[in-house]
């Protein structure tokens, strides 16, 4: 205790007070280093934010080392700043290698830049998602799924082309790029349940889509809860878009247009009108989403 008090006394009480200050300013290298430190500490998070921070801090420490060697002639100041410069340089190279090593096929690049990057998904997280999937080509007029025959065993996201959805030969709606092919079917089943498609999905043009196997995707969800919540939001939004697309085509009479926001009103006000297969399928789709 006495030793600490004596140290504090030597540093504060008995330390000589600066009576004369240097009149001339330090060299330009010193001020450049200070500016680089200020700007460097304004960097953000993520890979590119770290690259920004370590690059500017490294340059700042390098300028400080040069200033200590040329102007101050202090070996200890030079040594510390040079060591810190080397550490920042090594961190920069390590992070740059990580970013450079994350490369994707063209379909995944489109998917990331158009859908996942605007949501703030980092490249490492997207890489985890992409490694669990595969890119599949579907030729024109070939079927992705057939009504009453194809089992629901995967989840797919269209990257290019256009898919036509029909039920009993009657057109329902189109599926465009960056939309899921089978989000209602996926959402209608629990992880332990099995099911088959109630619609037919046919490629109107040559299509490319990214597909995740059902069991593999559920395993990914169990390992990464963040990815599970992300897909839950994406699938829910996709189902809502499909329901509103159906709403534009469903009529329950010559003068009545079925609105998904007022289903009970139409059931009470027009009970005598016979529903078409399209209307019935629309209501079944709503039941899937209500589960």
Curated annotation (Swiss-Prot):
Chain coiled-coil ranges: none
Tissue expression remark: Expressed predominantly in skeletal muscle (at protein level). Also detected in heart.
GO molecular function: cAMP binding
Topology term for the membrane: Multi-pass membrane protein
Keyword Zinc: no
Bilayer-spanning residue ranges: 27-44, 48-70, 77-99
Glycan attachment positions: 4
Taxonomy, superkingdom: Eukaryota
Chief localisation class: membrane
Record keywords: cAMP, cAMP-binding, Glycoprotein, Limb-girdle muscular dystrophy, Membrane, Nucleotide-binding, Transmembrane, Transmembrane helix
BP term (GO), one: skeletal muscle tissue development
Subcellular location: Membrane
One cellular component (GO) term of this entry: membrane
Keyword Transmembrane: yes
Disease: Muscular dystrophy, limb-girdle, autosomal recessive 26: An autosomal recessive muscular disorder characterized by adult onset of weakness and atrophy of proximal limb muscles, elevated serum creatine kinase levels, and dystrophic findings on muscle biopsy. There is no cardiac or respiratory involvement.
Functional summary from the UniProt entry: May play a role in the maintenance of heart function mediated, at least in part, through cAMP-binding. May play a role in the regulation of KCNK2/TREK-1-mediated current amplitude.
Family: Belongs to the popeye family.
UniProt name for this protein: Popeye domain-containing protein 3
Species this chain originates from: Homo sapiens (Human)
């Amino acid at each position: 205790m006495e030793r600490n008090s004596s140290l504090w006394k030597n540093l504060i009480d008995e330390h000589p007070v600066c009576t004369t200050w240097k009149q001339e300013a330090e060299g330009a290298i010193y001020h450049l280093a200070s500016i680089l430190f200020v700007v460097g500490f304004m960097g953000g998070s993520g890979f590119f934010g770290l690259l920004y921070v370590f690059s500017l801090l490294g340059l700042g420490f390098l300028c400080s080392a040069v200033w200590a060697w040329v102007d101050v002639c202090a070996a200890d100041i030079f040594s510390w700043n040079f060591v810190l410069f080397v550490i920042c340089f090594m961190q920069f190279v390590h992070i740059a290698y990580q970013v450079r090593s994350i490369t994707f096929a063209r379909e995944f690049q489109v998917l990331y830049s158009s859908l996942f990057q605007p949501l703030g998904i980092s490249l490492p997280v997207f890489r985890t998602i992409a490694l669990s999937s595969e890119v599949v080509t579907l030729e024109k007029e070939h079927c992705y799924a057939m009504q009453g025959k194809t089992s629901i065993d995967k989840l797919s996201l269209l990257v290019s082309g256009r898919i036509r959805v029909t039920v009993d030969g009657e057109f329902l709606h189109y599926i465009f790029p960056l939309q899921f092919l089978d989000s209602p079917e996926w959402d209608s089943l629990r992880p332990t349940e099995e099911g088959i498609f109630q619609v037919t999905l046919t490629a109107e043009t040559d299509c490319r889509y990214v597909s995740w196997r059902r069991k593999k995707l559920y395993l990914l969800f169990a390992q990464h809860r963040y990815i599970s919540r992300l897909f839950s939001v994406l699938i829910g939004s996709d189902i809502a878009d499909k329901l509103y697309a159906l709403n534009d085509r469903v009529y329950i009479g010559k003068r009545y247009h079925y609105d998904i926001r007022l289903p009970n009103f139409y059931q009470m006000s027009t009970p005598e009108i016979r529903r078409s297969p399209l209307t019935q399928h629309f209501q079944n789709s709503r039941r899937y989403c209500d589960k």
